[in-house]
A protein has these predicted regions:
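Catalytic cores of alpha/beta
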Residues: 63-68, 352-370
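Ferredoxin-type iron-sulfur electron-transfer modules and their immediate structural context
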Residues: 317, 323, 328, 374-375, ...
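Glycine/Thr-rich beta-alpha phosphate-binding loop at enzyme active sites
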Residues: 22-37, 242-342, 377-395
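A conserved short coil-to-beta-strand element within the FAD-binding core of flavoproteins
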Residues: 602-616, 631, 716-726, 732-735
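Rossmann-like dinucleotide/flavin-binding elements
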Residues: 540-561, 602-611, 625-633, 645-700, ...
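Glycine-rich phosphate-binding active-site loops on the catalytic face of alpha/beta enzymes
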Residues: 75-87, 240-242, 359-389, 691
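Rossmann-like dinucleotide-binding cores of NAD(P)H-dependent redox enzymes
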Residues: 559-562, 566-601, 674-720
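N-terminal capping/small domains of soluble enzymes
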Residues: 1-231
Length: 982
């Protein structure tokens, strides 16, 4: 495909709008239109019904973008910047992809990619459409919104014929061909509104925001603003760059908030507008505006230039936005507000979103424009929630900004969850699969779970208070609901789509809630099945993997026996993991659940050998003995292995420590050990790691808990020797990435010491190689193969993988059970476990932090019912939802509306690019030839051109070899969505 997008002719655009609204009650993917409350705010001699809108950028470039934003509640539109360079010349300077908004935002966009006259026409089309839609559909006052021009980048270009004509036409569009066409089309569509349509004001905009390039001299900025105020008599905002804060301030703020990896140097700070020049210039411009009876203010802020160092986007420089920009922007606001005693009007853009928009508005900062937040899942729908949040606040004319409140906001932002970067880099939320053309909706949490739990379904059952059915559904795949509900590493949560909104659904907590509330009913309903003849399984090891294997076998009627050397089942969770993380009661309940199926348990003695077990009639044997041998830390001194030491700490009646404890290693077990040492009275507890916190294998949550409890962290250090109350360490530095993707530690030859009386080695536990050798089992790198070289002997969990997670052990246990049983476990999911499409769609665009597990059903986005992330996140609306006659939703990509910005790619749960990989609708043969996408071109009548593997012409009235689902999609588009291509 080409990155060139086509403006939609106004008649086609309005046909789309009218048809979609009549049929669905929505427009351009905005599911819940905003109906204005009647309150207004005065600005520029006009009125706006809400203080929000899209910032000049990807969401304000095309008519459909602006209409979508209006439908969601936007009423202040800073339309995309125009300058003398435009069209193909400009587009050639923009690399693709050019937007990355998965976390903090980055972009490489400039001004409009359209030709300036095309951009003008898009804004006129949107203006006229909103004037009528607001009235006809009762969305608000037709005079309740404002269009604000954005122009740049130098006075010569602004005064040139191209941009000058644009400004004049936006100030008075009456003589433009587009304005006249709009009135004709609207009159044809809404004949009852003929007189009103004829009265639509051609004065599209009476205000402007000045955008200049980095390095623009202050004299040039002042000349541009003065020209627009005096010659064009336009209310004027001047956009400022965060560089006005100075390099040291920006670097300090970002570093302190976890953005130390963002690279930039001082040159923009030195070349951009300086504070000493800015203040007197703004005073002069304010006085000039006052003398002309016009409004003047500042737009804070522009995006922030940073270096491209991690292949985030093509090219060498990109522009930062979103949550990392907010602390810089609000600090700019604070300094401006104080400097001008609250008299300077501030228009805000720079990380505004739901969680801070009310504070900004209450402090007198408005209008508030957004970009990054509405580029994420939920898209334009996010505006509706923002509008509702401020509706209850007082609306009044601008009377000044609250300097104290803004200063408080600035200080608070440095510790605000919504703006802080996690300590550890966020893992990819994508699966390894490619998106199918049809039925692509999937729940990424399921894919992130080693046992593929039915997560949205059991959360929905919990939402409905059906805890018994929820736990029954959980235990279809998960034999340990209490253990996993307490200490599961919950990889599912790192995949959760809600991470793109606020924070993940608390899946583990919800599982534990179901376990606690549904346990009694589940136990009462269990019936021991009849035993299967001819099969008998021995399980060596009574940890989580062994318990899970016994559960799955017992449920299927397979006679099974667990052999455990300790006095009780539970393995590492019972004997090693500290009680402050998991209590024995939780383990006991999972054990009782397994025993309910009649499994035999033999504790307190080593298991017989494999050969002896076979002689006793066991047909299938599982070794699930864990990885209890300490990893070797080859240094002299007082060193203990973490597993043995933690078992000692847990089993002692009143363990007590003194002196300084150092834990070497940085996995979850290391964090547990360090926390145990701290709680047991150690003078200090310290983690020593060869890399930095970012590379630590421990879960982010476990790392934070250790830090919060006062555990010291010594990064980039390797132990050398412990003696005389000290641990000698060698400083390390990070070199090139190793096979794990983490940068390898490299010795520097520099040494230092820290207090240390005891070293705990937590550098990776090992499988008992002697046990394997004694039974003739061959070892691989970490342990034996799952199905070992010995007939009918399997190895699972830590004994197979090396140190692994509980849920990975359950996955191995299930695979072993399936091998023994000879068939996969089958079960039904009750209909009550599925949210309706309407319920799923209603959650889109709603940001909401977790409170407790009972609330999580309202936060789960039901991705397997409705995903549509690519449709939400496309600013141009180029990924549309097609509703088939059977109720299923499908995604169709519209080639002519896409500029290959790449934003949709970030939010697709597959390893796919929707703009390239979804079935595509083409407008012309040339477009189809210029693309590699699978898709369709309607040729007229029943004839279509379709590319799957090859391009082929089909007659839809005849039998053909098109896949049925593809043909069904094409026929639906022709029957119900012809406005997409006509």
């Amino acid at each position: 495909m080409s990155e060139k997008m086509y403006p939609i002719p106004f008649k086609s655009l309005m046909n789309w709008v009218v048809t979609e609204y009549a049929r669905e009650g929505e427009i351009f993917g905005v599911h819940t239109p905003y109906y204005a409350s009647g309150k207004t705010l005065p600005i520029f001699g006009e009125r706006i019904e809400t203080p929000f809108g899209p910032a000049a950028g990807p969401n304000s470039q095309l008519a459909q973008n602006i209409i979508a934003a209006y439908m969601a509640g936007a009423r202040f539109f800073e339309v995309k910047t125009v300058q003398k360079m435009d069209g193909a010349e400009l587009a050639a300077c923009v690399p693709r992809p050019c937007i990355l908004a998965a976390d903090e935002g980055y972009n490489q966009e400039w001004s409009t990619e359209l030709e300036v006259p095309q951009a003008r026409d898009e804004y006129i089309k949107a203006w006229c459409a909103l004037k009528v839609l607001s009235k006809v559909y009762g969305l608000g006052d037709p005079d309740g919104f404002v269009f604000n021009m954005s122009v740049g980048y130098d006075l010569e270009g602004i005064k040139g014929e191209k941009v000058d004509t644009y400004i004049n036409n936006m100030m008075d569009a009456s003589e433009t061909k587009q304005f006249k066409e709009c009135l004709e089309v609207l009159t044809e569509l809404f004949p009852a509104e003929k007189d009103y349509i004829a009265s639509i004001s051609p004065r599209v905009s009476r205000s402007v925001t000045v955008s200049t390039l980095h390095g623009c001299p202050p004299q040039e900025i002042e000349r541009i603003a003065s020209y627009l105020l005096t010659e064009k008599r336009l209310h004027t905002f001047v956009k400022c760059n965060p560089t006005i804060l100075g390099y040291k301030t920006a670097r300090t703020i970002l570093d302190s908030m976890g953005y130390d990896y963002i690279v930039f140097d001082e040159h923009h700070f030195n070349e951009d507008l300086q504070w000493a020049d800015a203040v007197p210039m703004f005073e002069r411009l304010q006085a000039l505006a006052d003398s002309k009876g016009l409004e003047f203010g500042l737009k804070l802020s522009n995006t922030f230039p940073v270096d491209t160092t991690r292949n985030e986007l093509p090219g060498t420089e990109m522009y930062m936005s979103g949550r990392s920009l907010f602390p810089l922007t609000i600090e700019m606001c604070s300094r401006i507000s104080r400097q001008f005693n609250g008299r300077m009007r501030i228009s805000f853009a720079g990380g505004a979103e739901f969680f801070n928009c009310d504070k900004l508005f209450s402090a007198g900062i408005w209008p508030i424009t957004v970009a990054t937040t509405i580029l994420k899942p939920g898209g334009y729908n996010r505006l509706h929630q923002m509008v509702e949040k401020v509706e209850g606040l007082p609306y009044h004319a601008f009377s000044g900004t609250d300097s104290a409140a803004i200063s408080d906001m600035s200080a608070a932002s440095h510790a605000d969850f919504h703006h802080l970067k996690p300590i550890k880099p966020v893992a990819s939320r994508k699966s390894e699969d490619k998106s199918p053309w049809i039925d692509c909706f999937t729940a990424p949490c399921k894919g992130g779970c080693p046992i593929h739990q039915d997560i949205p379904e059991y959360i929905e059952l919990c939402r409905k208070g059906l805890f018994g059915p929820a736990l029954k559904l959980i235990t279809e795949k998960n034999a340990l609901p209490f253990i996993t509900g307490t200490i599961c590493a919950h990889r599912c949560q790192s995949k959760c789509t809600r991470n793109f909104y606020d924070e993940s659904v608390q899946i583990r907590d919800t599982k534990l809630l179901a376990a606690k509330k549904g346990y009694g009913a589940l136990m009462a309903d269990i019936k021991v099945p009849e035993k299967v003849a001819g099969k008998k399984a021995a399980i060596i090891g009574g940890g989580p993997t062994g318990i899970a294997a016994a559960y799955f076998l017992g449920r299927a009627g397979i006679e099974a026996t667990i052999f455990e050397r300790e006095e009780k089942l539970g393995g590492v969770p019972r004997y090693v993991i500290p009680a402050f993380r998991i209590c024995d009661e939780a383990i006991d309940k999972d054990v009782a659940l397994m025993e309910r199926y009649g499994v035999e348990v033999k504790c307190g003695a080593p298991a017989p050998s494999v050969e002896e077990l076979k002689k006793c009639g066991y047909t299938h044997i599982l070794i699930a003995t864990g990885a209890w041998q300490a990893g070797k830390l080859d240094i002299p001194g007082n060193v203990k292995g973490v597993i043995g030491w933690m078992k000692e700490m847990k089993t002692q009646v009143k363990p007590c420590l003194d002196g300084h404890v150092v834990v070497v290693g940085a996995g979850n077990t290391a964090m547990d050990a360090a926390r145990v040492a701290k709680r047991m009275g150690a003078a200090s507890s310290t983690i020593v790691y060869r890399r930095t916190k970012k590379e630590m294998p421990a879960d982010e949550h476990e790392l934070k808990l250790a830090i919060d409890e006062g555990v010291n962290m010594v990064e980039l250090a390797a132990p050398v020797a412990q003696e005389n109350g000290k641990l000698k360490l060698e400083r390390m530095k990070l070199g090139e990435p190793d096979a794990s993707g983490r940068r390898s530690p490299v010795a520097t030859g520099e040494f230092f010491e820290i207090p240390c009386d005891l070293v705990i080695s937590a550098v990776g536990e090992k499988v008992d190689a002697k046990l394997m050798a004694d039974n003739g089992i061959e070892m691989e790198r970490k342990g034996p193969a799952f199905k070992t070289n010995v007939e009918n002997v399997w190895c699972a969990g830590d004994a197979h993988r090396g140190p692994a997670t509980v849920v990975e052990g359950i996955a191995d246990a299930a695979a072993f059970a399936e091998a023994v049983i000879g068939a996969a476990h089958e079960y039904d999911i009750p209909e009550t476990a599925y949210a309706s499409k309407a319920e799923a769609i209603a959650k889109k665009g709603i940001l909401k932090m977790a409170k407790d597990a009972c609330c999580e059903g309202s936060r789960c986005l039901d991705c397997s019912t409705v995903c549509e992330n690519c449709a939400d996140s496309c600013p141009n609306r180029a990924n549309v939802v097609i509703k088939l006659s059977d109720g299923r939703h499908q995604i169709l990509h519209i080639d002519k509306m896409c500029n290959e910005c790449g934003n949709c790619t970030q939010f697709c749960p597959y390893a796919s690019e929707p703009c390239h990989d979804k079935f595509t609708l083409f407008q012309t043969k040339e477009d189809m030839e210029d693309s590699r996408n699978a898709g369709v071109l309607f040729l007229g009548g029943d004839k279509v051109l379709v590319r799957l593997a090859d391009v082929k012409e089909y007659d839809l009235s005849q039998q053909n070899d098109l896949p049925q689902e593809i043909e069904n999609l094409i026929l639906t588009v022709r029957a119900k969505y012809s406005y997409l291509y006509n």
